[in-house]
Amino acid sequence: VKQDLATVCSGFTFIEGPIWNDVTGCLTFNDIPESRTYRLEQGKTVRLLREDTHKANGNAYDMDSNIIVCEHVRSCISRTNDQGENLEVLVSHYGDKELNSPNDVVVRSDGVIFFTDPRFGRNPSRVGLERPQELDFQGVFSFDPGTGELKLLADDFENPNGLCFSPDEAFLYVNDSPKKHIRKFRVEADGTLSGGAVWAETTGEEI
């Protein structure tokens, strides 16, 4: 499918975490190396929403229009209001060990947060801060802000990256970047995952 594309803003270093607000018509996104969050308003004006984001990556809106943020440098999931204010850390450790570097995040309709936790943000690169890894795996987690419960859902990834639900939230799709494939999990009634077979290969001439 061919579509005409138009540049609406430019001059960034490495953009991630775009989220759309259907009510305000605004697009919010992160520039990871610059530790900044920007907002494109009504497709016209870009303004700086936050600075010192600790090399934030993925974003998602929760049910109250707060922004759930994956922070590489602090290895945590944090939350702000829609204006990037009232920052608070929701979860940063699994047991007594730091999370690796939360990468991407989705919020289920009941408010439970699902996120990937690869090691990209601990590698020597412009999008992270080099430091030893405390966990001995790269996984997928869920976190319930209401109860404070953090669940490890899968730990057999090389480096999980993007994730999304099916429209009915019955399935969770997670890509494993180094392996160039996407896996499909069934979301069980208790919030755990089953299955996990490869659903699509992301290989090709331009990849």
Residue ranges of model-derived segments:
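Loop/turn-rich, solvent-exposed surfaces of beta-rich toroidal or solenoidal domains
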Residues: K180-V187, T192-L193, A200-I207
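Short, solvent-exposed loop/turn segments at conserved positions within beta-propeller repeat blades
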Residues: I32-P33, H72-V73, R122-Q138, S177-K180
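A short loop-to-beta-strand structural motif that recurs across blades of beta-propeller domains
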Residues: R36-Y38, C76-S78, Q138-F141, H181-R183
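A short helix->beta-strand "capping" segment at the edge of beta-propeller domains
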Residues: V1-T13, Q42-K44, L48, G196-A197
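Short loop/turn segments that connect beta-strands within beta-propeller blades
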Residues: L40-K44, N81-E85, D144-G148, R186-G191
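Beta-rich, blade/repeat-based domains predominating
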Residues: D4, C9-G25, D52-E71, C76, ...
